[in-house]
């Protein structure tokens, strides 16, 4: 599989376009500011009254309503939350989109599951940084980048001197992606593997494992503080080693005792039943059931902040003992407070 770097992308392509970034959340903030600082003409499209309007203006960005930002755009990057994208596209983007404009996404959810069906005259591409927006922004400002994926769903640029893939690479370069490396995939592959990774391993699997470990120690009489350190705080130390050089690299770095414990106890936690459950999760994603369940839950929201399933679980997480003991311990760790990835005042 080819990996594309800075020398493989022509940043002048995206610098010659008017780019509309729809949304100013974690990813929208990163993309808009990174492209702006790369010399791209960027307009942030937001709904009137959005709390993000002032934040974007304070960052030195041009801000307009979604409809107004789209009218003159050559490329529209839709970075609003997945559950809002279809309505925004149908009501504000589609009626104002230039015939030849390029639609871009950072996740294939709405295209792959056919919630958004673009016109045939619009090229459809994906530039998907493989990291949270806060990381995309912080690595860019530090001179680095986050590995990214690109995908082409529709290339309608037959009259141009460049292809939709050239545009995707150019955008990725302006966003810092080619500093780290860019891989090409498909909307289907990105969507299904991304959702599976989030649910079974990175978010759902990991947080459930952390909480179960914490609860096991506390229920056995150990202090919440020690349980927090052993089951949550140290995860970064281990995942950094894995990310750097793989699982064997982590094994090389840890003690023989820890390595032996990995081999004999890990399979008792992650069993054949766990893998069977993972396959069920993947099947729900592939069939579109997860997408429909998620969107149905969102439709029951009165304020746009999540439906009953989302809200009940979000509140349960907030009151879990690991959150309160963690907040107290982190407040005493000065090294954690020096450079935060998430600053809710600006992103």
Swiss-Prot record:
One Gene Ontology cellular component: cytosol
Residues engaged in binding Mg(2+) 2: 194, 230, 234
Pathway linked to the protein: Amino-acid biosynthesis; L-isoleucine biosynthesis; L-isoleucine from 2-oxobutanoate: step 2/4; Amino-acid biosynthesis; L-valine biosynthesis; L-valine from pyruvate: step 2/4
Cofactor note: Binds 2 magnesium ions per subunit.
EC number(s) given by UniProt: 1.1.1.86
Similarity annotation: Belongs to the ketol-acid reductoisomerase family.
Domain KARI N-terminal Rossmann, first and last residues per copy: 1-185
Cofactor: Mg(2+)
Species assigned in the record: Gamma-proteobacterium EBAC31A08
Entry function: Involved in the biosynthesis of branched-chain amino acids (BCAA). Catalyzes an alkyl-migration followed by a ketol-acid reduction of (S)-2-acetolactate (S2AL) to yield (R)-2,3-dihydroxy-isovalerate. In the isomerase reaction, S2AL is rearranged via a Mg-dependent methyl migration to produce 3-hydroxy-3-methyl-2-ketobutyrate (HMKB). In the reductase reaction, this 2-ketoacid undergoes a metal-dependent reduction by NADPH to yield (R)-2,3-dihydroxy-isovalerate.
Reaction equation(s) it catalyzes: (2R)-2,3-dihydroxy-3-methylbutanoate + NADP(+) = (2S)-2-acetolactate + NADPH + H(+); (2R,3R)-2,3-dihydroxy-3-methylpentanoate + NADP(+) = (S)-2-ethyl-2-hydroxy-3-oxobutanoate + NADPH + H(+)
Protein name from the UniProt record: Ketol-acid reductoisomerase (NADP(+))
Originating gene: ilvC
Keyword NADP: yes
Sequence ranges assigned to domain KARI C-terminal knotted in this UniProt record: 186-336
Positions of the catalytic residues: 107
GO biological process terms on file: isoleucine biosynthetic process; L-valine biosynthetic process
Gene Ontology MF term list: ketol-acid reductoisomerase activity; magnesium ion binding; NADP binding
Binding-site residues for substrate, renumbered to this chain: 255
Keywords, sorted A to Z: Amino-acid biosynthesis, Branched-chain amino acid biosynthesis, Magnesium, Metal-binding, NADP, Oxidoreductase
Pfam (any one): KARI_N
Binding site for NADP(+): 24-27, 47, 50, 52, 82-85, 133
Positions annotated to bind Mg(2+) 1: 194, 198
């Amino acid at each position: 599989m080819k990996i594309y770097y800075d020398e493989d992308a022509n940043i002048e392509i995206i610098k010659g376009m008017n780019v509309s970034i729809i949304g100013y959340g974690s990813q929208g903030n990163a993309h808009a500011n990174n492209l702006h600082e790369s010399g791209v003409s960027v307009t942030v499209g937001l709904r009137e009254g959005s709390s993000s309007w002032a934040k974007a203006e304070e960052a030195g960005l041009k801000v307009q309503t979604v409809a107004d930002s789209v009218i003159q755009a050559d490329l529209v990057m839709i970075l609003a939350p997945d559950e809002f994208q279809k309505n925004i596209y149908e009501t504000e983007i589609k009626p104002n989109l230039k015939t030849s404009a390029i639609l871009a996404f950072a996740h294939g959810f709405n295209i792959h599951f056919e919630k958004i069906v673009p016109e045939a005259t619009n090229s459809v591409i994906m530039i998907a940084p493989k990291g949270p927006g806060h990381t995309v922004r912080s690595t860019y400002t530090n001179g680095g980048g986050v590995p990214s994926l690109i995908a082409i769903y529709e290339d309608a640029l037959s009259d141009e001197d460049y292809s939709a893939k050239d545009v995707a690479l150019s955008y990725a370069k302006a966003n810092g992606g080619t500093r780290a490396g860019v891989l090409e995939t498909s909307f289907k592959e990105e969507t299904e593997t991304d959702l599976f990774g989030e649910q079974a391993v990175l978010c759902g699997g990991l947080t459930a494992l952390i909480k179960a470990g914490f609860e096991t120690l506390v229920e056995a009489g150990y202090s919440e503080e020690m349980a927090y350190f052993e089951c949550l705080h140290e995860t970064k130390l281990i995942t950094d080693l894995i990310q750097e050089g793989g699982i064997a690299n982590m094994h090389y770095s840890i003690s023989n005792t820890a390595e032996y414990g990995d081999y004999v106890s890990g399979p008792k936690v992650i069993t054949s039943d766990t893998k069977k459950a993972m396959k069920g999760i993947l099947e729900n994603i592939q069939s579109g059931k997860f997408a429909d369940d998620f969107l149905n839950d969102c439709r029951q929201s009165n304020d746009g902040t999540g439906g009953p399933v989302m809200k009940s679980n979000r509140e349960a997480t907030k009151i879990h003992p690991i959150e309160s003991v963690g907040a107290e311990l982190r407040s005493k760790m000065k090294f954690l407070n020096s450079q935060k990835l998430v600053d809710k005042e600006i992103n």
